[in-house]
Every structure is written in structure tokens, then in C-alpha cells.
């Protein structure tokens, strides 16, 4: 069974797949944050127009940008997301038992749901603020 037959989220457990996301990564040889080291730390490259060096942990979904050539990806990951369970996994993906993998992936799924829920809550609060402001402006016209 090849990596391409895995669900997309599970493909990210494979370091080589994470490495492949680092297209146009600005830090290559002679740097601490090479694509290989970034992938080892759980990161994928997800650049935007304004953040060309944006990287996100596929597991805890922590996003970091503003990388410097001497930044150590594992240390930066620990500093900004010390509770990420991916950092404590001592086995390669292929060495995990099914039970270990499913427990780990349950944590990843919970992280994803928490991130999405927080994002939706912020969107809701911003919309509520705009609506409240519009209502107050209408009330002031009376």
C-alpha cells in the first residue's frame, strides 16, 4: 500500500510527504531550518502571499512564520506548542501499532476540531460586533 492510497491527513505522518510541501522554502543548505529538519519537527510549508515562510505543524496546527536561518525547528515547535503530542512520539509512523496510531490520530483530530471551532467562534464574534454596530447606527437615526 503506497502513501497515495492513504487519506490526505494520514499522508502527513510520512516525513517525505511533509518534506515535499517545502516548495520555494527560503532556507536550504547551511541553515538549521532546512525542509528536512522542518518536516522532522512535524511542519508542513503553507506559504501565503504575505507570509512566504509560513509553516504549520500538521498535528497541533500551530502556525509559525518569520523563520531565521539559525532557528531550530524542534526547539521553536517546543517553545510555541509544548503540548504537541507529535513531539513526544519516539517511533516512525510505520513502526506504530494500529492502536498507537489511532490514539495519536484521535489527538490530531481533536486539535483540528479545536482550531476550526476557535476560528468559527472568532468569525461569529466579529460578525456579531458588526451587526451590533449597524443596529446602533440605525437606532441613532430615529
Curated annotation (Swiss-Prot):
BIR repeats lie at residues 18-88. Its main location: cytoplasm. The modification Phosphothreonine is found at residues 34, 48, 117. GO terms for molecular function: cysteine-type endopeptidase inhibitor activity; cysteine-type endopeptidase inhibitor activity involved in apoptotic process; microtubule binding; protein homodimerization activity; tubulin binding; zinc ion binding. The record marks 126 as: Interaction with FBXL7. Zn(2+) binds at residues 57, 60, 77, 84. It comes from the Eukaryota. One of its GO terms (cellular component) is cytoplasm. Keywords: Acetylation, Apoptosis, Cell cycle, Cell division, Centromere, Chromosome, Chromosome partition, Cytoplasm, Cytoskeleton, Kinetochore, Metal-binding, Microtubule, Mitosis, Nucleus, Phosphoprotein, Protease inhibitor, Repressor, Thiol protease inhibitor, Transcription, Transcription regulation, Ubl conjugation, Zinc. Monomer or homodimer. Exists as a homodimer in the apo state and as a monomer in the CPC-bound state. The monomer protects cells against apoptosis more efficiently than the dimer. Only the dimeric form is capable of enhancing tubulin stability in cells. When phosphorylated, interacts with LAMTOR5/HBXIP; the resulting complex binds pro-CASP9, as well as active CASP9, but much less efficiently. The BIR repeat is necessary and sufficient for LAMTOR5 binding. This is Baculoviral IAP repeat-containing protein 5. It comes from Felis catus (Cat).
Amino acid at each position: 500500500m503506497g502513501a497515495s492510497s492513504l487519506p490526505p491527513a494520514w499522508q502527513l505522518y510520512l516525513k517525505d510527504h511533509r518534506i515535499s510541501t517545502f516548495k520555494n522554502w527560503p532556507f536550504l543548505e547551511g541553515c538549521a531550518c532546512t525542509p528536512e529538519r522542518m518536516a522532522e519537527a512535524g511542519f508542513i510549508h503553507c506559504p501565503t502571499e504575505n507570509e512566504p515562510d509560513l509553516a504549520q505543524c500538521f498535528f497541533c496546527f500551530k502556525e509559525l512564520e518569520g523563520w531565521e536561518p539559525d532557528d531550530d525547528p524542534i526547539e521553536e515547535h517546543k517553545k510555541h506548542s509544548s503540548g504537541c503530542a507529535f513531539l513526544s512520539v519516539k517511533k516512525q509512523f510505520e513502526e506504530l501499532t494500529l492502536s498507537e496510531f489511532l490514539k495519536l490520530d484521535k489527538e490530531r483530530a481533536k486539535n483540528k476540531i479545536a482550531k476550526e471551532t476557535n476560528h468559527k467562534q472568532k468569525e461569529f464574534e466579529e460578525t456579531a460586533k458588526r451587526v451590533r454596530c449597524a443596529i446602533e447606527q440605525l437606532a441613532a437615526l430615529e
